[in-house]
Amino acid sequence: MAKHLFTSESVSEGHPDKVADQISDAVLDAILEQDPKARVACETYVKTGMVLVGGEVTTNAWVDIEEITRRTVREIGYVNSEMGFDANSCAVLSAIGKQSPDINQGVDRADPLEQGAGDQGLMFGYATNETSVLMPAPITYAHRLVERQAEVRKNGTLPWLRPDAKSQITFQYDDGKIVGIDAVVLSTQHSDDISLTDLQEAVMEEIIKPVLPAEWLSKETKYHINPTGRFVIGGPMGDCGLTGRKIIVDTYGGMARHGGGAFSGKDPSKVDRSAAYAARYVAKNIVAAGLADRCEIQVSYAIGVAEPTSIMVETFGTGKIAEDRLVALVREFFELRPYGLIQMLDLLHPIYRKTAAYGHFGREEFPWEKTDKAALLRDAAGLK
């Protein structure tokens, strides 16, 4: 596998699945703002002219689901009926119940550190030193393309852009190192009054060139900009959207394994979310410490049990110390019980709406991106 291609994709904040994710996390944030100990599992479905918000919530807080939903959709940019979805006129339906007491009795404990996991499951975290944010380059730059699409849409640089968009980048690797970009795909929703030629030229100049490093582009790089020729109907009018359907976009773009659990709409007692964040934190600190060039962590849990049922470290032949030694360091320096990792990463705050578009990892504003354990790990490993 000396030379190979690897591809990752991302989607914009206006993609219907991401609209659903953002509504779910906006509801979560509103509840956590009033009640940090709330139990929240919020799922959202969006389609032409309607939003259905459902799930299980146990809290003393009261939040206005309809107002939160409309505000979120408005901020994304769906504000007129020509797009098939309008924050001001769409129907908002709520079907939220309480969390099962059977689950709750397995989670709550007199000693908070003995709080059990909210469900069984396996979670992965990953880091690599191929970018400055210790994330794989394909997903990092795929995110940056659609983030740039939203920026030039909202600031009026390209006023004919609409909220829905997708990106995909194929990188060329040689012996594990990036040598170039083989292909770029960017499909963006647009108004009916822009020609394909003008759109392709503007997207190249205002989105692709400002984002992708010139040294990775060449005359052999292939560009597919709105390759169907037309993308006027999009967003929830084009496809229904559901919370939790973009789990690879949310994580590592396929470069690492995935346990299957989605993130959005879940409070930190759900290890699907919080333990995946903790696993990223562990992997990133191992790479930042110079103990490996690439690192993947797996943790697993049983419902109602505090201690992880397993911890695994894989360094793909790049580790500077043995992997069993790395596992011992993880156990020594990181708290991976559900309550402990919530405290370690300070997760009981309304920070989740921002995670719900453009990736949960590689963004320095989030606490699981800290590398504050790197020096401790390096010293403990005996590396100078």
Swiss-Prot record:
Region of interest called Flexible loop, as start-end residue ranges on this chain: 99-109
Source organism: Yersinia enterocolitica serotype O:8 / biotype 1B (strain NCTC 13174 / 8081)
UniProt cofactor(s): Mg(2+); K(+)
UniProt-recorded name of the protein: S-adenosylmethionine synthase
Catalytic activity of the protein: L-methionine + ATP + H2O = S-adenosyl-L-methionine + phosphate + diphosphate
Biological process, per Gene Ontology: one-carbon metabolic process; S-adenosylmethionine biosynthetic process
Major location (coarse): cytoplasm
Keywords carried by this UniProt record: ATP-binding, Cytoplasm, Magnesium, Metal-binding, Nucleotide-binding, One-carbon metabolism, Potassium, Transferase
Gene: metK
An example molecular function term from Gene Ontology annotations: methionine adenosyltransferase activity
Binding positions for L-methionine per the UniProt entry: 56, 99, 239, 270
HAMAP family named in the record: S_AdoMet_synth1
Quaternary data: Homotetramer; dimer of dimers.
Cofactor note: Binds 2 divalent ions per subunit.
Pfam families for the chain: S-AdoMet_synt_C (PF02773), S-AdoMet_synt_M (PF02772), S-AdoMet_synt_N (PF00438)
Enzyme class, UniProt record, top EC level: transferase
GO cellular component labels: cytoplasm
Similarity remark: Belongs to the AdoMet synthase family.
Binding site for K(+): 43
Pathway: Amino-acid biosynthesis; S-adenosyl-L-methionine biosynthesis; S-adenosyl-L-methionine from L-methionine: step 1/1
UniProt-annotated binding residues for ATP: 15, 164-166, 230-231, 239, 245-246, 262, 266
UniProt keyword annotation of Transferase present: yes
Residues that bind Mg(2+): 17
EC identifiers of the protein: 2.5.1.6
Compartmental location: Cytoplasm
Chain's role: Catalyzes the formation of S-adenosylmethionine (AdoMet) from methionine and ATP. The overall synthetic reaction is composed of two sequential steps, AdoMet formation and the subsequent tripolyphosphate hydrolysis which occurs prior to release of AdoMet from the enzyme.
